[in-house]
UniProtKB/Swiss-Prot annotation:
GO cellular component: CCAAT-binding factor complex
Location in or out of the cell: Nucleus
DNA-binding region of this protein: 164-189
Organism, scientific name: Arabidopsis thaliana
GO molecular function, one term: DNA binding
Main location per the UniProt record: nucleus
Subunit record text: Heterotrimeric transcription factor composed of three components, NF-YA, NF-YB and NF-YC. NF-YB and NF-YC must interact and dimerize for NF-YA association and DNA binding.
Name of the featured protein: Nuclear transcription factor Y subunit A-10
Sorted UniProt keywords: Activator, DNA-binding, Nucleus, Transcription, Transcription regulation
Domain of life the protein comes from: Eukaryota
InterPro entries linked to this entry: CCAAT-binding_factor_CS, NFYA
Length: 269
């Protein structure tokens, strides 16, 4: 019976298994109904000066009877270690558990609602400072695109700065009065005015040359009048023979009158 009592687990509350409430000698000695009546703390490496930064362990030995009986008679005892399941950084309240992110801060049980303290990883901003010479390293495939976009932005900013934001109303009215072409662009009035001035000069030159044309026409008429007598007589013979011969061609009188009026040939009838 004595060995069974020694090997039986300690009767401790179930919420102490999470390690949020540390065990003390007063709490263990106050439970008279339990089979363990004495508690003896064993010094560990943490008490000797070697302290682990992440976890700390404390060993407790439980033996039946008082402390005197345990010292006098060596009896088998059960030793177990209670390791805190939380990280301790020197704060008064325990930190969150790694396995259970949503844990009650005071009772050590998994809460039904999410905790206010987030356990996700913190996004650290990248180092935005450039090198001393101001160079920025980019991907080789994106270099040309970046340069092209920078040039287009610089060009757009330059145009927006040079252009005046307001145009006077008189300039707008003047633009509305200017003649436009089929495409909507303004016509060049200087070339149109030059074309208009060239047309009267051409007409004057043609008028100047009219007397010369008259002299040329008169010389042509003189040349036509100076035909040889033989040609005239031959024509007279041809006309007379064709007009009076019964089988020959008869030339109408109207044609003769028209030919005489034109002056292409002068006939002596």
């Amino acid at each position: 019976m004595q060995t069974e009592e020694l090997l039986s687990p300690p009767q401790t509350p179930w919420w102490n298994a999470f390690g949020s409430q540390p065990l003390t000698t007063e709490s263990l000695s106050g439970e008279a109904s339990d089979s363990f009546t004495g508690v003896k703390a064993v010094t560990t490496e943490a008490e000797q000066g070697v302290v682990d930064k992440q976890t700390s362990t404390t060993l407790f030995t439980f033996s039946p009877g008082g402390e005197k009986s345990s010292r006098d008679v060596p009896k088998p005892h059960v030793a177990f270690a209670m390791q805190s399941a939380c990280f301790e950084f020197g704060f008064a309240q325990p930190m969150m558990y790694t396995k259970h992110p949503h844990v009650e801060q005071y009772y050590g049980v998994v809460s039904a609602y999410g905790s206010q303290r987030s356990s996700g990883r913190v996004m650290i901003p990248l180092k935005m400072e450039t090198e001393e010479d101001g160079t920025i390293y980019v991907n080789s495939k994106q270099y040309h695109g970046i340069i092209r976009r920078r040039q287009s932005r610089a060009k757009a900013e330059k145009l927006s700065r040079c252009r005046k934001p307001y145009m006077h109303h008189s300039r707008h009215l003047h633009a509305m009065r200017r003649p436009r072409g089929s495409g909507g662009r303004f016509l060049n009035t200087k070339t149109a005015d030059a074309a208009k001035q060239s047309k009267p000069s051409n007409s004057q030159s043609s008028e100047v040359f009219h007397p010369e044309n008259e002299t040329i026409n008169s010389s042509r008429e003189a040349n036509e009048s100076n035909l040889s007598d033989s040609a005239v007589t031959s024509m007279d013979y041809f006309l007379s023979s064709s007009a009076y011969s019964p089988g020959g061609m008869v030339m109408p009188i109207k044609w003769n009158a028209a030919a005489m009026d034109i002056g292409c040939c002068k006939l002596n009838i």
